[in-house]
Amino acid sequence: MTLRNKTQKFTAKMVGPALVGALVLANVCAPRALAQGGHAHAATADQTPPTQEQLNQANALVKIVKDATARFQNVKQAIAEGYALQFGCVSGDGSGAMGLHYVNGALVGSGIIDATRPQIVIYEAQPDGSLKLTGADFLVFANAWSVNHSDPPQLMGQLFHLFDAPNRFGLPAFYTLHVWAWKDNPNGAFVNWHPNVSCASYGAQNQ
């Protein structure tokens, strides 16, 4: 079965049970939104240089996500735990790509953010047909979040960004935060697009 044949209807899986486990929500330092092409910012980005505390917190978040997703280096493990490919391979015009989003429908829709349980794990298709884990994506629907919160979500100092509706994914408005924990992004660990991620191999395998 090709990767494209594994793609399923995403919106039917959006409502799942509440997440369990410890939450790692940021309330230590002020929100800092890094430049993220392709998303509407949830708030105006702070252009001042980050403090050492903010840098430490950002590095800590990357480590937490990397440790929490290490087992998903084998995509079969992600599939076994309920993640499934959605949207095909997401690429941008001149800004690189996001890659392949494997979404856990049971973790989406609760309005809860847990740094150790990302709603999405991200892969890049390789020329040999394998998939390489590149990072994770945290996603919460705007309407679910707004029930109990007046401010946009943030995770350990990183402000989520808003995708308004309608959008290319056909979803209601949602907040999202990418964490490139497994493939260094020269534009920053939390930007949406990765200039060194490509959909070329995915496209070649699914022609």
List where the protein language model places each region.
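Cleavable N-terminal signal peptides
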Residues: 21-23, 33, 40
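Bacterial N-terminal signal peptides
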Residues: 16-27
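N-terminal secretory signal peptides that target proteins for export/translocation
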Residues: 1-12
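Sec/Tat signal peptide C-region and signal peptidase I cleavage site
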Residues: 29-35
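Primary mode marks residue(s) on the alpha4-beta5-alpha5 output face of response regulator receiver
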Residues: 36-207
